[in-house]
Regions:
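Surface-exposed amphipathic alpha-helical tracts and adjacent flexible/coil segments at the periphery
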Residues: 1-10, 15-21, 26-33, 51-52, ...
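Glycine-rich, positively charged N-terminal anion/phosphate-binding segment
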Residues: 37-56
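Short beta-strand elements of ligand-binding domains
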Residues: 64-65, 95, 115-117
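Conserved phosphotransfer cores of two-component systems
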Residues: 108
Length: 409
């Protein structure tokens, strides 16, 4: 049985390093252009170079998204961008547009080419076509069942790889080809600027009563008719393996380091446990469920994997996340006094109980003993986001440990 790759997103250099440390086999990132995530922090060329070097030093691959649906005016920019990427040396480019693919073949043929889910890859004929064009991997359309993916595996060359999203947010539109954002706001989802109108509240209009807007109530908060639950396949690793999927992809190029660390660590352990012993995987199932629920999410569904989703896969009464923990920061360097630096993300205080999340699966509850600013002044709390601080938690920490606080129920 071929060990599947765990492919994790990263919105920034910091998050890439966390993904690597917390168990990713590969990380996918976007540059400042052509990557379909205009709102993400994204990577400068300098950060991308450092990220690729860091990942490769830890035996982890890096894939760069270039899955924009390009217009004529984009093509020369794509060519220049790929020439720069050639010097950096990522392991693959993720592409959906045939014109962009053609440029990649011309400019950097030595870099693997993976076909994005945006290309609507729903059948083995599509896979065979892209294989003939030299693609190493194709990402399945979100609308495929495990049975369909298994059939694709049976009809394509063994060396061709199948990548599938197994966790994260679900777009209500067909493989993400949505026009709602463009229609409502002029921001094109296929150019990376989606405003997520699927999460908004809607009313209906009866055609003979123009101007009369009728709310469709589920309860006092209204209804969110396009609002999908999040995909989660942590309980179905055996079925993913049986389908012949080579790469298990986590959605989330706009997520925090806490989210990425939590999901990467949980799936890393689940995959490794099952390959070691299916019994061990079953015995640890409650731990996986508990851990995967510790990051922000919108309730869970298995999507299309076991057939077309029904009403149970939608959230009708809210567009809000479930939030179990608050992200406080990432542990950095240690000073001579045994304090550790962090760039804090949310407020915490001296005397407060927080958790240290470690890559090996341990969560350590600690009390904040002291907080100092970068000039050495003692502080009672950390109220300013992104402020550099020094902290004493009374325990030994490691670089890239994650600090979080459990929210009150």
């Amino acid at each position: 049985m071929r060990k599947p790759e765990l492919l994790v997103p990263a919105s920034s250099l910091e998050v890439l390093k966390v993904a690597v440390i917390f168990g990713a086999d590969a990380v996918y990132i976007g540059g400042e252009v052509f990557g379909l995530r205009a709102k993400a922090k994204n990577f400068s060329m300098e950060d991308m170079k450092e990220g690729v070097e860091f990942a490769h030093a830890h035996g982890v691959k890096v894939y760069v998204t270039a899955n924009i649906l390009a217009h004529n005016q984009d093509l020369e920019g794509v060519r220049a961008y790929f020439a720069e990427l050639k010097e950096i040396g990522p392991d693959a480019l993720i592409i959906s547009d045939p014109g962009v693919y053609r440029i990649a073949m011309e400019v950097c043929p030595e870099i693997e080419r993976h076909i994005s889910t945006q290309a609507n890859n729903t059948n083995y004929g599509t896979y065979q076509f892209w294989y003939e064009q030299g693609a190493k991997r194709v990402v399945t359309a979100r609308e495929l069942s495990l049975a369909e993916i298994k059939e694709i595996r049976e009809h394509i060359p063994e060396e061709m790889e199948i990548e599938t999203f197994i966790h994260g947010a679900m777009c209500i539109s067909y493989s993400g080809r949505c026009l709602l954002s463009n229609y409502f706001t002029g921001r094109d989802a296929n150019q990376g600027a989606c405003t997520h109108p699927c999460r908004w509240k809607y009313a209906v209009v009866e055609e003979s009563r123009p101007g009369e807007y009728l709310p469709v109530y589920e309860n006092e908060r209204g209804t969110y008719i396009f609002n999908s639950k999040d995909l989660c396949m942590i309980e179905h690793i055996p079925d993913l393996l049986d389908a012949g999927i080579d790469s298990y992809k986590i959605e989330g190029r706009m997520k925090t380091a806490l989210y990425v660390a939590t999901v990467a660590r949980t799936y890393r352990k689940a995959i490794d446990d099952y390959l070691e012993s299916p019994k061990k995987y079953e015995e640890n199932m409650e731990w996986y469920r508990d851990q995967i629920s510790n990051c922000t999410y919108r309730q869970f569904t298995t999507g299309f994997f076991y057939g077309k989703p029904d009403h149970e896969s939608q959230i009708y009464d809210s567009n809000t996340y479930v939030k179990e923990y608050t992200y406080l920061g990432i542990v950095g360097e240690k000073d001579e006094q045994g304090r550790y630096t962090i760039e804090q993300r949310n407020k915490f205080s001296v005397g407060e109980e927080i958790e240290v999340m470690k890559p090996d699966g341990d969560n350590i509850t600690v009390t904040v003993k002291g907080i100092w600013d970068d000039e050495g002044n003692a502080m009672e709390s950390a109220p300013h986001p992104k402020q550099k601080l020094w902290i004493d938690l009374g325990v030994e920490l490691d670089k890239f440990d994650i600090l979080r606080r459990k929210e009150m129920e």
